[in-house]
């Protein structure tokens, strides 16, 4: 089968790899769609890989084309599925509480083992969810980031019956999906989205968000002054020092601030903002990954239900590419991230069968 292999930093090429033997609890999934995540950009071009060679890709959907002998009646050949990419140990304290995202010894498709930038992938059947009727494979690939957003919004403690104000810092794919999820789950919530890219904010306005463009120091400072202590909840999704500290400044007394993105540098919080956290009694909480299977609030079930009932994350797909185009595309995404070149894109979808 063909795979896009990261052989070293900044080097991804398509190679033929032998099919792996199917284990008893696995299903062979022929991959139909895989999203490129910002973590793939860092892993592929920012030196963030755990090992080489690596097949990346963890936002994926496909069709089951073979069953391991112990899969039983859970799935059938021909089922369209999406993949929860985290493989928990099922033995640690977190796993015993079904908090699989906090597993201390987890494995992961696309980072700690080979993932979906390939024609096929053998996936443990526990990690598969059947796509509801009418959900496309493109939307199926984006269930994973949608579930991550659902989890982050849940951490924000938005009150359903209250007219509350939420600020989302960062209008990437996650931020734009977050606007739509909030609109579905919390119609009384006023959503404000902040970013430095106008083309992303124009999209957000279609979904009913109030937007602020902060592409200069002056516009950023004006935003901080205008909205000081203005929001009941803040979700940080940009991963910059400026947005992390801004969340403290724009939060109301008693507000909850959700930190949801990885940092590429150390975060130093000025003493005045530490004092603000204390005086306003702000809650700062982290969010990572999503809740999956076995709990009353399964983010994946919520995400699938939203998509089955009209949410269309695939509408944010900027382009669809094949395996051979992954290297050049991730290079462009990385250069945009480090502000070397401009590349206006929200979500790129890989279709390995192209």
Model regions: which residues?
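Short SAM/SAH-binding signature in class I
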Residues: 231-235, 256
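Short amphipathic alpha-helix with an adjacent loop that forms part of the alpha/beta core around
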Residues: 218-228
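Glycine-rich phosphate-binding loop and adjacent beta-alpha segment
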Residues: 242-309, 351-354
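C-terminal hydrophobic helical "lid"/dimerization subdomain
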Residues: 198, 245, 298-354
């Amino acid at each position: 089968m063909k795979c896009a292999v990261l052989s070293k930093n900044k080097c991804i090429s398509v190679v033929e790899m032998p099919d792996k033997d199917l284990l008893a609890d696995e299903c062979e999934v022929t991959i139909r769609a895989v999203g490129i995540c910002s973590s793939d950009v860092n892993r592929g071009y920012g030196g963030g890989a755990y090992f080489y060679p690596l097949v990346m890709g963890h936002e994926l959907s496909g069709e089951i084309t073979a069953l391991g002998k112990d899969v039983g009646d859970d799935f059938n050949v021909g089922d369209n599925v999406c993949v929860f990419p985290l493989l928990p140990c099922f033995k640690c304290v977190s796993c015993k509480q079904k908090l699989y995202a906090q597993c201390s010894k987890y494995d992961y498709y696309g980072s700690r083992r080979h993932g979906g930038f390939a024609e096929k992938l053998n996936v443990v059947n526990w990690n598969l969810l059947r796509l509801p009727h009418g959900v496309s494979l493109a939307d199926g690939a984006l269930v994973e980031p949608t579930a991550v957003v659902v989890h982050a919004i849940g951490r924000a403690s938005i009150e359903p019956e209250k007219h509350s104000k939420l600020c989302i810092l960062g209008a990437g794919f996650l931020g734009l999906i977050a606007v739509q999820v909030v609109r579905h789950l919390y119609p009384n919530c006023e959503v404000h989205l902040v970013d430095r890219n106008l083309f992303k904010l124009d999209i957000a306005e279609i979904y009913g968000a109030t937007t602020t463009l902060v592409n200069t120091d002056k516009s950023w400072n004006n935003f901080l002054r205008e909205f000081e202590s203005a929001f009941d909840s803040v979700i940080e999704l940009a991963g910059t020092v400026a947005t992390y500290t801004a969340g403290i400044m724009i939060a109301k007394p008693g507000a909850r601030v959700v930190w949801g993105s990885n940092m590429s540098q150390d975060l130093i919080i000025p003493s005045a903002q530490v004092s603000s956290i204390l005086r306003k009694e702000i809650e700062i909480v982290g969010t990572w990954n999503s809740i999956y299977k076995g709990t009353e609030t399964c983010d994946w079930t919520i995400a699938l239900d939203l998509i089955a009932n009209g949410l269309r994350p695939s509408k944010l797909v900027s382009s669809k590419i094949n395996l051979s185009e992954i290297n050049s595309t991730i290079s462009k995404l990385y250069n945009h991230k480090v502000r070397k070149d401009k590349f206006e894109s929200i979500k790129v979808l890989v279709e390995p069968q192209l």
